[in-house]
Amino acid sequence: SHRIEKPADTTICFEKGKVYNVGVLTLKSNDTVYIEEGAVVSGCVYADHCDNISIVGNGIINGACWHLPDSNADRFFIYAKWCNNVLLKGFTAVDGPSWHVVPAACDHVVIDDMNIMSRIVTGDGIDITSSQDVEVKNCFIRSTDDSICIKSQRLFEDPSTVRDVTKVRVHNNVIWNAEPGNAIELGYALQSEIHDLVFEDCDIIHCQYEGNMGGAAISIHQADGGHVHDIHYKNIRVEQAEQKLFDIKVLLCRYTEQLAKGEINDIYFDNIQVLNGDIPVSMIRGYQTPTEEVRVHDVHFDNITFMGNKCETWQDMRLVTELANDIYVNGARICRQMKF
């Protein structure tokens, strides 16, 4: 992280050379928290209906006090709900009790130059939940579950956290997805519309084998009723994908709350490079019951390369499709309709 000097408007300061046991640090509007390099803050940080809040600095927030060594706890680590103008910059968030950085139903959020490292299952890195106008950049994320995740769902039974997700840009991040989960994930809980998201110029250095529903470098898992469309992935380098490269599915699973399923369409992948390791499989699958059919459609793959070799066909990509229409590889439609 780049060195950050103490802001003039700092309201809460944690000084270097000290360990602070804060329990739950609750912020209010216009708070600026400065964590000096060499300071360790032990606890969680929450903000509810706040405007203009910042956590900056080069110190550490440690969440290990909130969970047993090998299990999670029923709380988030850094959690902002219904907040406006949020800045998280420079500090390291390590070993939280569950999801690590969670902006929920927030507007105008910047997450910049952070290090996020989790160790326990459900230790998601960043969960952008029902938020709009969000930028995530220059971060290193090593997570034992989804690394960067988009959701729209009730949190702790609060229906107010179900809202559209739009205007999200994720760029210039380094991602290590450890078992389980996915590296860049939309889902599973997508209960409102998800649209106009951009993921670009990121490095996925590891996406480890999961052996369950996830395990993809880039995934969209629609288990609910929100419409997912106009999602762009550009200039992403994958150093290791042990299970899957792309995984796009509409499905029923244990996370489902809405039985009527939302569509997935107008998804764009451009210049995605697998640099080494085994050649991973990719999957696109829609949803079908005796009374409902939802097909994934209009998915575009351009300039996908494995170890420098361009994939010209769906066979080159090791792409499997089911209940999918209008899938394109380098501009050529590979299927109108496929049934198994």
What label would you give each PLM region?
Residues 1-340:
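Extracellular/periplasmic carbohydrate-active domains that bind, remodel
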